[in-house]
């Protein structure tokens, strides 16, 4: 009797037979070795992992969701890691406080011993401590054991739902609000004394504003001098760069500076103040060193220009003009040119003009000759100082180069017509300005006739005339070197070498004739004052009155100085010249358009020596004694020329200070020399 065995259909092979064992995976008939798992049979080749396909017949496996999976794939998909060693747990597992451990990993964090069965476990954060170790722990605060939490806002227990951890407290999400406006804080917040605030309410009550942008500061703040700035708003007012952390900064009012920028600004301010003080009494448009600038002086707290200052008596202008070596200048070319030309018409040479006035004169003379003479050619043959070509036919002007000044000074004299070579060139008559009623000095110059032999011999000796006729019409003497015919040597007193230049014999006659031509009583009075001042002897303000008979050296101006390169100088014996008795008491014709102070103009006569008319020996001093301090020049030696401090340096020290020789220095323009002297603190 056959009994039927109940058959369960294979899901892989629904067709089945009760007499044949079929594979659970592929459904084919199983022959030979088979694997039986839970009453299911498999071919050995068919019993593989459902994920990676590896064979499971010789290794362990897991069955989950009707799938056979190897150990590695099961751990990656469904495995549990140990909370201590972070490895997958297979076999026994210990769960405590929602965490799982290997039995060997569940030990005390302090003594590293396994927990006894049934013992209490103290959990503090990430550490599990046994009861023995928890009692021996020294702590000022009791260890919080995880348990029921209370909201810091409503003080109720947080039983379920999401909690918020802020300010080291737990809150209900709906309880974490701004203390002022009660807005739920879901984003950024600012706390003060453990109380949360929204950003706007915190700034309104406790906020700090930036001094630059006037906005509230959130985050990093830069504090300096009790003021607060955003790090990006605190910038140097000079270089506009931000300050790095810990960098030093200067605070001036509402401005911040880098230390280097502050020092540079102070230096620029001093330089600007210095330039402003020099041009404080000059009108707009004038510039320092310009050839069109005229000396202005301060007398009795009043600013006087050249025109007004020239009308003062010389004694008043000498002793009451304040600091003539530092007074400013202003352009007044119209009056300057007229008065200077009139002074030349009265017989004075440009050696009497100041360095600034001579520059104006030379530029004016150059423009007049260009405009009046169509045959004038501006070529390198002619000197840059405005010296016209020397022709023997020109009886009105010829130029005598200064000893060392680097520029040519016109010397007015009358030449003998018969000693000149005939030529077609006729020099134009210069310096003729029509007279005006407003200025008593505007009188036309007195020109002598060409054929007047007597007047020609008065103004120039025959040797001088013969020497000047040696120059060819296309060659002019070098303005930087003096010709040998202009000086006569002598053996004078052994004390101090003295020298003088011959003056034109007709100058005093011209002055007398101009005196008679003046119809105005004021003009005659002013000219008498000048004649009286010229005929009087001035006292040296730097020498005591009792030493008036001692030998004194006259202070020197820009035109004539002692040679340093050995060029010949004129020496004349006082006892052998009858003209000295007549003119020794008069001040020399020096280069001074204004009546400057005695520091630059007074010349003295000593009966034991010859008269010094524009030449002197400079006493050598160290460079440190000649430096000009900020509080004035009261510390300088008394016998120095304050307008030419560089002349008191030795040749070696002069080269060290200026980087050039004295002759090279004299060839520079006046403004350039003054700038170099300012840089060397000798001005």
Swiss-Prot record:
It is found in: Cytoplasm. It comes from Homo sapiens. Residues 615-683 form the HP domain. Its main location: cytoplasm. SMART domains: LIM, VHP. The modification Phosphotyrosine is found at residue 376. Residues 380-393, 406-426, 454-471 have a biased composition (Polar residues). Expressed predominantly in heart and brain. Residues 21-80, 80-140, 149-208, 208-268 form the LIM zinc-binding domain. This is Actin-binding LIM protein 3. Residues 372-472 are annotated as: Disordered.
């Amino acid at each position: 009797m056959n009994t039927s065995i109940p058959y369960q259909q294979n899901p892989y092979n629904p067709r089945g037979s009760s007499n044949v064992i079929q594979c659970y995976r592929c459904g084919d008939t199983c022959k030979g070795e088979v694997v039986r798992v839970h009453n299911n049979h498999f071919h050995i080749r068919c019993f593989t992992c459902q994920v990676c396909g590896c064979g499971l017949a010789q290794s362990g496996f897991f069955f989950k969701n009707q799938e056979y999976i190897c150990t590695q794939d099961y751990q990656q998909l469904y495995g549990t890691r140990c909370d201590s060693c972070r490895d997958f747990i297979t076999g026994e597992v210990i769960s405590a406080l929602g965490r799982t451990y290997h039995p060997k990993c569940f030990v005390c964090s302090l003594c590293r011993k396994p927990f006894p069965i049934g013992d209490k476990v103290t959990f503090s954060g990430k550490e599990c401590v046994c009861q023995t170790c928890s009692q021996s722990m020294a702590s000022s605060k009791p260890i919080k054991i995880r348990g029921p939490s209370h909201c810091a806002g409503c003080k109720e227990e947080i039983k379920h739902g999401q909690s918020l951890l802020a300010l080291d407290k737990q809150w209900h999400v709906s309880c974490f609000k701004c203390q002022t406006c009660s807005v739920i804080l879901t984003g950024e917040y600012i706390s003060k004394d453990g109380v949360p605030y929204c950003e706007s309410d915190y700034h309104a009550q406790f906020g700090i504003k930036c001094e630059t942008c006037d906005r509230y500061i959130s985050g990093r703040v830069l504090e300096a001098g009790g003021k607060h700035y955003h790090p990006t708003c605190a910038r140097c007012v000079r270089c506009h760069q931000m300050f790095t952390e810990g960098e030093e900064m200067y605070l001036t009012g509402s401005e911040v500076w880098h230390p280097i920028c502050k020092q540079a600004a102070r230096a620029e301010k001093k330089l600007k103040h210095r330039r402003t003080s020099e041009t404080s009494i000059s009108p707009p448009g004038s510039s320092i060193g310009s050839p069109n600038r005229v000396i202005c002086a301060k007398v009795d707290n009043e600013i006087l220009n050249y025109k007004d200052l020239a009308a003062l008596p010389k004694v008043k202008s000498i002793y009451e003009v304040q600091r003539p070596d530092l007074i400013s200048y202003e352009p007044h070319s119209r009056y300057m040119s007229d008065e200077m030309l009139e002074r030349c018409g009265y017989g004075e040479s440009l050696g009497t003009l100041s360095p600034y006035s001579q520059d104006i004169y030379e530029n004016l003379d150059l423009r007049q000759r260009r405009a009046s003479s169509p045959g004038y050619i501006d070529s390198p043959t002619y000197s840059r100082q405005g010296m016209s070509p020397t022709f023997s036919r020109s009886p009105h002007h010829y130029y005598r180069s200064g000893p060392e000044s680097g520029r040519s000074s016109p010397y007015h004299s009358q030449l003998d017509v018969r000693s000149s070579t005939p030529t077609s060139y006729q020099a134009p008559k210069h310096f003729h300005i029509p007279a005006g009623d407003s200025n008593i000095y505007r009188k036309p110059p007195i020109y002598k006739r060409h054929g007047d032999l007597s007047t020609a011999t008065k103004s120039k000796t025959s040797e001088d005339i013969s020497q000047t006729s040696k120059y060819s019409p296309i060659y002019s003497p070098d303005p930087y070197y003096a010709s040998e015919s202009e000086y006569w040597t002598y053996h004078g007193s052994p004390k101090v070498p003295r020298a003088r230049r011959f003056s034109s014999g007709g100058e005093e006659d011209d002055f007398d004739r101009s005196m008679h031509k003046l119809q105005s009583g004021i003009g005659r009075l002013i000219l008498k004052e000048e004649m009286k001042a010229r005929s009087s002897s001035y006292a040296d303000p730097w020498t005591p009155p009792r030493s008036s008979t001692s030998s004194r050296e006259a202070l020197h101006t820009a035109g004539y100085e002692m040679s340093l390169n050995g060029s010949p100088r004129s020496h004349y014996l006082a006892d052998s010249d009858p003209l000295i008795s007549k003119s020794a008491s008069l001040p020399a014709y020096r280069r001074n358009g204004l009546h400057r102070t005695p520091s630059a103009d007074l010349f003295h006569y000593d009966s034991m020596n010859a008269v010094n008319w524009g030449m002197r020996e400079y006493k050598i001093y160290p460079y440190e004694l000649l430096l000009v301090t900020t509080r004035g020049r009261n510390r300088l030696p008394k016998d120095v020329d304050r307008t030419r401090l560089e002349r008191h340096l030795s040749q070696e020290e002069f080269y060290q200070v200026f980087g050039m020789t004295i002759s090279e220095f004299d060839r520079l323009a006046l403004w350039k020399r003054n700038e170099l002297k300012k840089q060397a603190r000798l001005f």
